[in-house]
Amino acid sequence: MFTLKFGTTLLYSIPSMILYAMTVRMVSRFSKDFSRTFIQLYIVFFVFNIITFFNSFITVRIPQNTCKDCFMSFLFKSHTVLNPSWFPLNVFYFIHFYMAYAQFFLIFLTSLNRFSMIFWSATYEKAWNRAFPFVIILVIVLPVPFTYTILPSWTYYAYTETMDCYSTSSSVDRGFLYNQLLPFMATITIATAIINIASFYKLTCMTYKISIAERNLLFMSGSLFIVQLLADVNTTLNRLVVNDNNKFGIWSQIAVTLLPYISDGLTLIHPWMFLAFSTKARRCFMLMYFPKYAKVAVTATNSVRFVTVNKRSQVQDAVRF
């Protein structure tokens, strides 16, 4: 079970989830220093991503890192196609596909939020605050029509001899599930690309300035789109080359091997990008968790300078800009 691949994923995924939780606590603590709609989307993303992360251990991580006679193999041998399971494995497999829809749609919403900020900077916040409850309902409900058939199905683990590991499957035709998922992902990816291109083009043509913080969050949403595009390509590869006829081929093995890493990219990259692109986020993060090393960048003329402080109270108001 504890293969090099499994250890590698744990090496970066556990620190990433800890950092994710720390940044969520940070934006909640310094809520006045960030856009309210951005905070709401960030926290919702965190909830969905943490569910995805822990669910992946059951549907992807542990099965893919368990050989035929490994310590944990008895769990998978007891739920084969000859002895399929229903609850709760069907729920975990349902969540596996459900979250693919939810994550892609949330990346689109993040880009849409930045798009509306660029084009309607004076009114976008009020509009998003009013619409946000309905947006969340849409995020929750939207994947259900595409994934509900998994819930009443029989679910099991299949052993792949060439890779000496297990994978999750169900009585629902795999091609049927991917034939629904791929058009959705392609449509959302294209829509995300269009609004990101429009946002960056508008940014270069603007005669007035938006805050550096808002601009950097736009760059963050653009970077999330790149990860989304990679996930789309890998999912397409899974659909085209992983089937009963060639599931033991090299391309099938590559697609299956990359799946947990691509999933991690969608799930764990947010806090790293947030801190990388947002100076304000880095300041608030340092102020909250490492106050002795926190730096402020405020002067009487609003120019930027950095000073080291020893007390949180010295910079409590200075981080807003």
Swiss-Prot record:
GO terms for molecular function: transmembrane signaling receptor activity. It holds the Pfam family Srg. GO terms for biological process: sensory perception of chemical stimulus. It is found in: Membrane. Keywords: Membrane, Transmembrane, Transmembrane helix. It comes from the Eukaryota. Its main location: membrane. It is a multi-pass membrane protein. The chain crosses the membrane at residues 1-21, 38-58, 89-109, 131-151, 181-201, 217-237, 254-274. The keyword Transmembrane helix applies. PANTHER family: SERPENTINE RECEPTOR CLASS GAMMA, SERPENTINE RECEPTOR CLASS GAMMA-33. Belongs to the nematode receptor-like protein srg family. This is Serpentine receptor class gamma-33. The gene is srg-33.
